[in-house]
Regions:
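Bacterial N-terminal signal peptides
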Residues: 9-18
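An acidic, Gly/Ser/Thr/Pro-rich helix-cap/linker signature
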Residues: 21-171
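Alpha-helical scaffolds flanking conserved acidic
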Residues: 174-181, 198, 245-250
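Extracytoplasmic and endomembrane cell-envelope/extracellular-matrix remodeling and assembly machinery
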Residues: 115, 132-159, 163-166, 170-171, ...
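Short, surface-exposed glycine/acidic/tryptophan-bearing loops
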Residues: 191-211
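Bacterial N-terminal signal peptides that target proteins for export
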Residues: 1-10
């Protein structure tokens, strides 16, 4: 694209300081937490702030406060299990399931329990009553501790939080939605799920096409700010369709249509949906998604209380940005702004390999991040032509290096 035809709208990103969070009462009204959900919220707070990557928890899926065991994982404690660790966890889980099956069998036949069995049964009955013994062996789940990962996510969020808040504020949505990446990705730009979801906001390719730019040259899922706008569009659509934030947030995991079916059966009674909705794919992940969001929001609102050893938040960095009005080659942008292409690519992670090879342009409407001061430098060098209108200062969400 020739920059001599006035095809760029130039914007200097001026970012607001971190604002105060809403009061707890305001949050409670928007994001209610029933007494029945509190058990799950506290469980996820423990997963993220108490139990480490070296620990594995065996718990009841329906009653997560029933924690049977917390055991140490054989080293090394990496990001994912080794084959040996996976087998070790499986063995511990199956051994517990066998013990629970024996307890259920004895309870059915009125056979006395051993002291160890009585202690194990008591863990269940204190929370779920005697009826909880039935099927307990089928409700055992293993959960690895994620304290280190969540802690690092809190630190990384310093890079993006204010920008995300500004996006949701501009969209007229609750600002607390900016904490959703704690659940989805721990704020990791390069996060990829087994389902093909990508980026901080974890969009699949199909969903992303509806809410952001997806072309051979650009994948906005990998630009945290652009993806936040896509998330805002999605969540507004979900809220308008479903009528409550618990339903809309859960749809981020389960889909709008899936939650519409649940709402049509049970109305807006979200706790009842969690207890009684038996949709085929409405499993543990979907049932816990909103509780995880509530837990993440509580931790993020007062991180020092959960990480007393201290945190070192990433510094929010400012950048200039431009929005292109027609398809543009990235090499042309690098030349125009006298910024080495590798440097531009580092702060524009949404650019695809094809764009960097020059075989696919960036689409019209794409926003390009430039090193802070680039527009001022270009202006001072006298590079103001009819093709490059004067930069307009506006308020815009903050961005930073956006490195993985």
């Amino acid at each position: 694209m020739s920059l001599r035809r006035g095809v760029l709208t130039l914007l200097v990103a001026l970012f607001p300081l971190m604002g105060a969070r809403p009061t707890p009462a305001a949050v409670e009204t928007t994001f209610p937490c029933s007494e029945s959900m509190r058990e799950g919220v506290e469980f996820w707070k423990n997963v993220w702030t108490r139990w480490t990557l070296e620990q594995v928890v065996l718990h009841d899926t329906d009653h997560p406060s029933i924690v049977y065991e917390v055991f140490e994982l054989p080293p090394p404690a990496g990001e994912v299990y080794t084959d040996g660790q996976r087998e070790y966890v499986k063995g511990r889980r199956e051994a517990l399931q066998a013990r629970l099956s024996a307890i259920e069998l004895k309870a059915t036949g009125a056979t006395p329990l051993s002291d160890d069995e009585k202690a194990l049964a008591l863990k269940i009955t204190e929370v779920a009553g005697s009826a909880g013994i039935t099927g307990a062996s089928q409700r055992v789940r293993s959960q690895r501790g994620l304290r280190e990962r969540f802690r690092r996510g809190i630190e990384i969020s310093g890079r993006y939080h204010d920008a995300f808040v500004a996006v949701f504020r501009e969209a007229g949505l609750p600002e607390d939605l900016a904490d959703l990446p704690h659940v989805e990705s721990s704020f990791q730009v390069a996060a990829r799920s087994s389902a093909g979801a990508v980026g901080v906001w974890q969009f699949t390719r199909g969903a992303a096409r509806k809410f952001m730019l997806m072309t051979p040259g650009l994948d906005e899922r990998l630009d945290p700010i652009a993806a936040a706008r896509g998330a805002a569009r999605y969540l507004k659509t979900a809220y308008d369709a479903l009528g409550s934030w618990p339903l809309a947030i859960t749809s981020y995991n389960h889909g709008i249509e899936g939650m519409r079916v649940a709402r049509d059966r049970f109305g807006l009674d979200f706790p009842k949906i969690l207890d009684e909705y038996d949709g085929r794919t409405f499993g543990f992940a979907s049932k816990n998604f909103y509780k995880e969001f509530l837990a993440a929001r509580e931790i993020a609102s007062d991180p020092a209380a959960y990480f007393p050893e201290g945190l070192v938040p990433d510094s929010p960095l400012t950048h200039d940005r431009v929005r292109i009005n027609r398809p543009t080659a990235v090499h042309g942008l690098a030349s125009r702004y006298s910024v080495p292409l590798p440097g531009l690519a580092a702060i524009n992670p949404a650019w695809t390999a094809r764009a960097l090879r020059g075989s696919a342009p960036l689409p019209a409407g794409a926003e390009i991040w430039l090193p802070q001061g680039t527009l001022e430098r270009v202006a001072n060098l006298g590079k103001k032509t009819k093709a490059q209108p004067k930069a307009q200062a506006v308020d815009a969400p903050r961005a930073d290096t956006m490195r993985p």
